[in-house]
Amino acid sequence: MEKIALITDSACDIDSETVSKYNIRILPFKIIYTDREYTDKVDITSKEIYDNMKSEIPKSSQPTMEDIESAYKKLEAENYTHVIAVVISSGLSGTYNAFKIVSEKFESIETYIYDTKSTSVCEGIILKNCGELIEAGKPFASIVQAIPEMKKKLHFFFVFGSLEYARKGGRIGRISGTIGELLD
């Protein structure tokens, strides 16, 4: 019998009701300011981060290998046989690679790591759909096969009032940011 766990990172935008219903494990990013550090969605809210951006742009750091390993140890202790990890774009974070490295240490748990090539709501929608499929009794292989099709149906657009924060936060390069600002 398959016991499937869902895991994501705190870049995922998903409501607490869905997290609770499908027992989704969320591994937090670190939010780093010059003189302080917070655990995303534990010590600091998204609203607080946005409010603080007026005075300082934080850096972020992916969930640590230790955090991922700890989550896997708990899943192993709870007799999970499979993990579906839906994570932030590998182009924005090393989370995908960290999951790959750690998951290989846990041979008793078959893992599928999905690089959303996106973030936020995209991760959340895919996880909710996976939760529904698990609840319906679908097998791991079937769910994993369905994920890329789920993603094809999702299209998101981000509109920035300014590229300043993306540039200062290190998400786009100085030259790209400057060119983008000039085109604005």
Which sequence ranges carry the predicted segments?
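Mixed-charge interfacial surface used for oligomerization/domain docking
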Residues: 2-5, 11-19, 24-25, 29-30, ...
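N-terminal glycine-rich anion-binding loop in soluble enzyme alpha/beta folds
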Residues: 4-63, 67
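Glycine/small-residue-rich loop that forms an oxyanion/phosphate-binding "nest" at active or ligand-binding sites
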Residues: 85
